[in-house]
């Protein structure tokens, strides 16, 4: 009897999605041959809700190992709205279950980040056979040491910081580089250290703008005519850290900004007298071909997911723990975020190197 396996990619795109899809497909075909049928769900959970899917064949998975983005398309479908019936009067959960049934799926593989995993857990609790695969450049999925897409994004953000050094030095400027990472600062921490940033500001380490300016001033006194500040998009100051997320987000909206980077740049220029500029690489960090590391990781994850399909182990997500690929229960990781802990060795390394954390 043939197995029918559905695959979807949800949330923001990142390098390695196609490599993971390929890893799943090649491993399934190697194991089951003609006794497996793969169904591509288009545009993430949105396609599962609206019934958009297509039958796929081996040719669809050729030549995609190095390809950025996702051949299945993706859309953001917030978990908080999954049980909300909006103006279109669609019961999203019921619609997803219907598509699963209509497509005659034996299981569904969901590639995505934290929101994707929360919805995957919801579907698992609703009785569907679901397996998750951890995708995010933020590296913040609970229960796994690394997610595919992260290392490529580190390479990209590091190159941005590398290139900013020369223009900062040439113009005697302070450069604030905004790195993606709203709730977790892994990407900023890794790329900041790899790129030689002088100041690294993370969501987990609330900053004091006076300390930031003091760090810039110390460098100037030692003869450095520039400073590089790597700012996570979710960085917050010590006063904001005392508020609930919605409260400080509302205050920022009133002030006309969403991230701290422009405010930091303005304050540094005013307090130090040094010309300050902002660089936001933005979605460049999500784009392009995955690194060799991410291609290997994606292949490991994809092939392991195929093994889970073979043994019919569902309600889990793939993870890397202590250099071993394992499966974590969705209910154990859904809704949790892997933040940079205070005891993180890289924070210690940064401090030893004289890097200011704000």
What do the predicted segments below correspond to?
Residues 8-9, 40-42, 73, 110-112, ...:
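Short beta-strand segments
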Residues 12-15, 87, 114, 144-152, ...:
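Alpha-helix capping and helix-loop boundary segments enriched in small/acidic/polar residues
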Residues 20-24, 114-128, 188:
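Short Gly/Thr/Asp-enriched flexible loops that form oxyanion-binding sites at enzyme active sites
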């Amino acid at each position: 009897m043939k197995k029918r396996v559905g695959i979807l990619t949800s949330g923001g795109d990142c390098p390695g999605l196609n490599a993971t899809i390929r890893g799943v497909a090649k491993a399934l075909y190697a194991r089951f041959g003609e006794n497996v049928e793969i169904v591509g769900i288009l545009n993430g959970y949105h396609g599962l809700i609206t019934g958009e899917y297509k039958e796929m064949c081996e040719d669809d998975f050729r030549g995609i190992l190095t390809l950025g983005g996702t051949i299945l398309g993706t859309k953001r479908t917030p978990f908080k709205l999954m049980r909300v019936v909006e103006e279109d009067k669609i019961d999203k959960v019921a619609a997803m279950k219907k598509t699963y049934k209509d497509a005659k799926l034996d299981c569904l593989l969901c590639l995505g980040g934290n929101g994707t995993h929360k919805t995957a857990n919801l579907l698992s609790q609703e009785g569907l056979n679901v397996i998750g695969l951890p995708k995010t450049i933020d590296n913040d999925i609970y229960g796994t040491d690394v997610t595919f897409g992260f290392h490529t994004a580190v390479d990209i953000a590091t190159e941005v910081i590398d290139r900013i050094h020369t223009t900062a030095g040439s113009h005697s400027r302070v450069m604030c580089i905004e790195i993606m990472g709203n709730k977790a600062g892994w990407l900023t921490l890794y790329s900041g250290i790899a790129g030689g940033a002088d100041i690294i500001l993370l969501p987990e380490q609330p900053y004091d703008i006076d300390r930031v300016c003091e760090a810039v001033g110390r460098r100037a006194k030692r003869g450095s005519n520039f400073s590089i500040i790597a700012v996570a998009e979710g960085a917050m100051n010590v006063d904001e850290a005392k508020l609930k997320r919605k409260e400080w987000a509302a205050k920022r909206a009133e002030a006309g900004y969403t991230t701290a980077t422009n405010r930091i740049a303005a304050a540094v220029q005013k307090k130090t007298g040094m010309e300050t500029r902002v660089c936001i690489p933005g979605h460049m960090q999500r784009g392009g071909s995955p690194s060799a590391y991410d291609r290997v990781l994606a292949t490991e994850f994809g092939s392991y997911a195929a093994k889970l399909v073979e043994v019919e182990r569902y309600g889990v997500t793939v993870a890397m723990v202590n250099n071993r690929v394992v499966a974590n229960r969705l209910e154990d990781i859904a809704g949790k975020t892997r933040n940079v802990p205070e005891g993180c060795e890289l924070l210690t390394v940064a401090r030893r190197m004289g890097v200011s954390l704000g």
